[in-house]
């Protein structure tokens, strides 16, 4: 998956982006059992509610960035863990990437997604040097875009398929639930708090 959870002892040091150790884990296991960290149960979360959850988690991200000064969001808590800004850049790019993958799944038969190296992108695009205000704007726009596209899905479209570059197969249903774990999990990464993922009146996750 695109998700990474980089835990390490806290430090005030600001270190080069290439200190991050690439994450080679396959995060498709989140479709089988609840995440022990962020507690999202993607296996049982309704795909039809992903659109709304995307907007709520985007609001949580905007609040995190708005509440912290620029020097704080740029500071890594440890050499091998992204800063809040770097995580936000990653989430913004996940919204963009998965929106394009969703478009492919809805318009083409069994597409294979182009590969994406999240760690290489973080270095090449200089996540740590980006403008937090622009990241906020782009993250909000990306969330609105993919939420709107998920909101159009209905009926048999949930069963349409697509393939990751490593051959892993998704339906639009499993793709939606796999995807939404990423921004939810990264809220936990940067705040240590687990956000409610069900709407008011529904059972909390």
State each model region's role.
Residues 50, 54, 80, 139, ...:
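Aromatic-acidic/polar surface patches that form glycan- and anion
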Residues 2-32, 72-122, 144, 159-205:
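Short, contiguous alpha-helical
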Residues 44-48, 131-136, 176:
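Active-site rim elements
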Residues 23, 28-44, 53:
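Secretory/endomembrane lumenal or extracellular ectodomains immediately following the signal peptide
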Residues 53-66, 121-160:
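Acidic/histidine-rich alpha-helical segments that form the ligand environment
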Residues 35-41, 119-127:
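A short small-residue
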